[in-house]
């Protein structure tokens, strides 16, 4: 095998070399774990036009405003995996950050949707995800000390959701006023750092642990 036993960066370079020979490339991202996302981020930062994707397919946790609650839980889950490492990259935020630097054509997939004229998505079931999200989210917010920081996270997650949505065909039809609300990547990085510095945020992570 060309990649067996090689360091991750070399593996990415081999894959990139193969991809550069394909004229039309679409990519399916099934979930947002960093081990799956890191290759995409590496390629997007490569900025080689031969690696441009025609379309990137993502799980639909972005098409409706109420899905921002799900994004809050995704952000928290990612932070909790390695809460002892303050420099840890949050995968969902890393994806949005990369997309702001290198905008892509996105399509959101949910259970039952046909894509590429031959494949059918099995996940996510948006109704099931919403029910599970509401149960967990509401349970956290019962703690009065955490309600305010959860609201901060919700507002932040909604901004991330709008960024992803703006790169879909449906989202591109947004009014110009909505598009103007999308800022540069560093603005969101600064806001995320501010939220993580809130004392109640540390209390929230301790509560969830």
Where are the language model's segments positioned?
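Active-site metal-binding motif and surrounding structural segment of the metallo-beta-lactamase
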Residues: 5-58
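Short acidic, S/G/P-rich loop/turn micro-motifs used as interaction or catalytic elements
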Residues: 2-6, 34-35, 63-65, 127-129
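Generic alpha-helical structural element
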Residues: 4, 29, 84-88
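Flexible, acidic/histidine-containing loops and adjacent segments that form or flank the divalent-metal
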Residues: 42, 46-209
């Amino acid at each position: 095998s060309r990649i067996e036993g090689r360091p991750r960066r070399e593996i990415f370079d081999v894959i990139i070399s193969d991809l550069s020979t394909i004229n039309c490339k679409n990519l399916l991202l099934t979930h947002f774990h960093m081990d799956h996302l890191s290759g995409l981020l590496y390629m997007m930062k490569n900025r080689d036009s031969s690696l441009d994707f025609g379309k990137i397919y993502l799980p639909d946790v972005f098409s409706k405003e109420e899905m921002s609650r799900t994004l809050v839980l995704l952000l928290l889950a990612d932070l909790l995996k390695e809460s002892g490492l303050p420099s840890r990259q949050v995968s969902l935020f890393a994806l949005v950050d990369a997309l702001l630097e290198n905008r892509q054509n996105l399509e959101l997939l949910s259970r039952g949707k046909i894509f590429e004229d031959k494949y059918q998505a099995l996940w996510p079931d948006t109704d099931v995800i919403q029910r599970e999200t509401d149960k967990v989210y509401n349970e956290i917010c019962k703690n009065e000390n955490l309600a305010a920081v959860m609201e901060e996270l919700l507002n932040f997650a909604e901004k991330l959701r709008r960024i992803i949505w703006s790169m879909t065909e449906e989202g591109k039809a947004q009014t110009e006023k909505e598009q103007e609300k999308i800022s540069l990547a560093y603005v969101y990085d600064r806001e995320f750092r501010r939220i993580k510095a809130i004392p109640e945020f540390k209390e929230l992570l301790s509560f969830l642990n």
